[in-house]
Amino acid sequence: MADKKEVIQNWPLETGDYAVGNVESPVAVVSLGSNMNDELVAAGAAISGPLHTENLGIEKVVANIISNSNIRYVLICGSEVQGHITGKTVEALYENGIDEEKKSIIGSPGAIPFVENLPVEAVERFQKQVSIVSMINNEDVSEISSKIDECISNDPGAYDEDAMIVEFNETPEEEFEVDEVTFSDDSAVDLASIVLLEVENRISMMNNEIKQIASLEKISSGYYAGKIEGIVIGFILTLVFLIIIIQGL
């Protein structure tokens, strides 16, 4: 059995829209624009949640992962978030790290990939502690669950170093993407662009929720559609029989 370390109290430390399972599991799941929290935690993940922003959102993901030395895999799945491109940005962070002065994620395709609250040491710890498993744009719970099982089977054991705690200098306003970034003078991103991206993100989240509701209603919708169709056919047949009877008289 793989060696494990005691998990710090109140883990995960950073708040978010996630579900928590076995905290000694080696797998953390980032489901991007999809919400499959309960299913993937049930499949064996230590933590599972969506990731909608390539700045504060990624900061929280990194902080929660490096504060649990048992996590050795970050499985990225679900639908990519358009505009923010959070999945590819996590991969860029893992592969390239950050610009120490600008605090930007090197090579990120996202619009605002700034991680103001993450020290270089935290990013380096993230890079050393975990391996990235990429299943971007895959929403098949069965396939993702199988990959979780595979990671658990190959668990290398807890990372050698103890949990690393990242303190966020966070105020209520910093929950909004507009306020969380400090731009350099040569930045080409203006306030209007950021606000538009936030609107786009909200629309994307609403679309995902609508898709989930639609999938749940699919069976009942089909049932009622078939029922209505049967009533219409019965009504037409009744009219035909009445016409035949009347003509016979």
Swiss-Prot record:
Q: Where in the cell is it found?
A: Cell membrane
Which cofactor is recorded for it? 5-hydroxybenzimidazolylcob(I)amide
GO terms for MF: cobalt ion binding; tetrahydromethanopterin S-methyltransferase activity
Q: What is the free-text note on the cofactor? A: Binds 1 5-hydroxybenzimidazolylcobamide group.
Stretches in topological domain Cytoplasmic: 1-227
- Annotated TM spans: 228-248
Enumerate the InterPro entries for this protein: MeTrfase_MtrA/MtxA, MtrA
Mind listing the GO biological process terms from this record? methanogenesis, from carbon dioxide; methylation; one-carbon metabolic process
Membrane topology (Extracellular): 249
What is the E.C. number?
7.2.1.4
| Class of this enzyme | translocase
Residues that, per the record, bind 5-hydroxybenzimidazolylcob(I)amide: H84
Q: Which domain of life is it from?
A: Archaea
This enzyme catalyses: 5-methyl-5,6,7,8-tetrahydromethanopterin + coenzyme M + 2 Na(+)(in) = 5,6,7,8-tetrahydromethanopterin + methyl-coenzyme M + 2 Na(+)(out)
Topology with regard to the membrane?
A: Single-pass membrane protein
Q: Name one Pfam family in it.
A: MtrA
Q: Which coarse location class applies to the principal site listed for this UniProt protein?
A: membrane
Q: In which pathway does it act?
A: One-carbon metabolism; methanogenesis from CO(2); methyl-coenzyme M from 5,10-methylene-5,6,7,8-tetrahydromethanopterin: step 2/2
Subunit structure comment from the entry? The complex is composed of 8 subunits; MtrA, MtrB, MtrC, MtrD, MtrE, MtrF, MtrG and MtrH.
Q: Which family does it belong to?
A: Belongs to the MtrA family.
Summarize the protein's role.
Part of a complex that catalyzes the formation of methyl-coenzyme M and tetrahydromethanopterin from coenzyme M and methyl-tetrahydromethanopterin. This is an energy-conserving, sodium-ion translocating step.
- Protein name from the UniProt record: Tetrahydromethanopterin S-methyltransferase subunit A
Q: Species name for this entry?
A: Methanosphaera stadtmanae (strain ATCC 43021 / DSM 3091 / JCM 11832 / MCB-3)
**Organism ancestry:** Archaea, Methanobacteriati, Methanobacteriota, Methanomada group, Methanobacteria
